[in-house]
């Protein structure tokens, strides 16, 4: 098997998960979704984060509404399953690590600015079918995985990378799931 830089980095992250001890989350506040500003238009070009993601990730040129601020159609690969989507109204932009989960694993004390950065981080945003997003909800990696193995392995690697990037706790049950699943994934 040929190893890419991403594969090697994922292996390093997986190895560190096996030996590191999870840190207890200091959850002192209740999760309130409105405390996490999302779909921001930080560059003030009338395209919010959702529109930016749809435009950037389309496999074809997108069609926009008359004002040019909302994406109508394009061609997107689903992150969780081997499907292609063509209508923007039929897809969700999902937070790979759900906002509520981040809140419960170390982000509860973040500033509003830090929460906004996380909620709009393209690395944590994926395109998927609405029903898959609803099935996943705020579940962690120990409660939900894509059914398709190839997609599960990428999901695990991205989950670990984002947890590491944002210094979020990997719960003991997550670690157990990661340890058992990484044997099936070829990193």
Model-based region annotation:
Residues 71, 76-187:
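Domain-level detector of nuclease and nuclease-like folds
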Residues 43-44, 52-55, 59:
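Extracytoplasmic c-type cytochrome modules immediately beyond a signal peptide or single-pass transmembrane anchor
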Residues 2-10:
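Sec-dependent signal peptide recognition
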């Amino acid at each position: 098997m040929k190893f890419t830089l991403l594969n090697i980095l994922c292996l390093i992250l997986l190895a560190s998960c096996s030996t590191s001890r999870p840190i207890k989350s200091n959850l002192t506040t209740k999760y309130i979704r409105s405390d996490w500003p999302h779909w921001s238009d930080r560059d003030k070009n009338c395209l919010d984060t959702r529109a930016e993601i749809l435009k950037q990730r389309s496999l074809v040129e997108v069609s926009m509404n008359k004002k040019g601020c909302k994406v109508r159609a394009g061609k997107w690969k689903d992150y969780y399953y081997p499907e292609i989507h063509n209508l923007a109204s039929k897809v969700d932009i999902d937070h790979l690590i759900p906002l509520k989960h981040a809140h419960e694993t170390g982000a509860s004390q973040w500033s509003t600015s830090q929460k906004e950065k996380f909620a709009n981080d393209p690395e944590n945003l994926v395109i998927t079918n609405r029903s898959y997003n609803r099935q996943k909800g705020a579940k962690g990696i120990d409660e939900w995985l894509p059914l398709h193995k190839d997609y599960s392995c990428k999901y695990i690697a991205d989950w670990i990378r984002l947890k590491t990037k944002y210094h979020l706790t990997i719960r003991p049950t997550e670690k157990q799931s990661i340890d058992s699943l990484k044997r099936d994934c070829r990193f």
